[in-house]
Amino acid sequence: MGYDLHHGNAFQVLEEEYDENSIHAVVTDPPYGVVEFETANVEKMREEKGGVWRIPPELDGNKRKPLPRFTVLSDSDKEKLRNFFKTFGEAVERVLRPGGHVFVATTQLLMHEVSKQLDEAGLERRDVLVRETKTLRGGDRPKGAHERYDMVSSMPRVYWEPWLLYRKPLDGRLQDTLDTWQTGGLRRESEERPFTDLLEGGKTPKAETEIVKNAHPDPDDAEAHPNLKPQYLMRELCHAALPLQKGVILDPFMGSGSTIAAVHALGYNAIGIELDDTFFNMAENAIPNLAEVDTPVETRGDFAQQGDDSASLTDFS
């Protein structure tokens, strides 16, 4: 078991480094509106200058993290988003094995745009997973008029997060695809309970946020990744992604490494790609420590025996 990390453009890395039908699953939290994670806007977020990121007012004296606005996309921004996810869909469709699943975190406002591009790339939509989580996103009073319109919210407070679930078409029947490619299905939570589309995990624990914050390459500017996902959630998804507990999971937008850490903790193999210098360095530093976090996923009956059957990355090359 192990992981390979690449610093660069995900689409270029996949094209140059990975063959067709070589990846078993994709689990990723891509740039939500794409425009938020352009270099200039990430720098504004880090400097707390706002821009397309909203810098929330303090709440009971507590400083709140910057949040993507999501509602500021122009027609040209939307076209960029469509082109981005069209390229993403085509890239992962090429490297995925037949029957390989794709788990994609998205937002209520944009998931229809993302879904359409994945459809057109030849992937099959299987479900929308619902992550229950109370966030500080949405529910805000009008910008610059908090007191004047104190009983007005610009949009609902978001209490759930959608994850699109897609699959590359099977090679024959499901059992044929499992036999040939080790893909096509989802790992059950137990013999009695299948994987479900209602996800627990809730808010990212403070201990995990601190791990990532401390992994920042510049101690004077240390801050956790703005969309850090909890290990419980990511291990739940990564456990489901490999039905036979064998294979390689790809995260082409790994951020500070939560997916890669989850895969590593489960004893699977992973490939992570990240374009941003700071996030890549954070991932390198944070992954080993995030992988040491305990979650309920490791208590499942099939977890202990999995280590005996684990393979290395080279077995799938």
Regions found by a protein language model. Give the residues of each.
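Extreme N-terminal starter segment of soluble prokaryotic enzymes
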Residues: G2-D4
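Class I S-adenosyl-L-methionine
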Residues: E16-T28, Y32-R82, E93, F103-V104, ...
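Conserved SAM/SAH-binding loop
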Residues: G8-Q12, F303
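Glycine-centered, small-residue-biased loops immediately flanking beta-strands
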Residues: G100
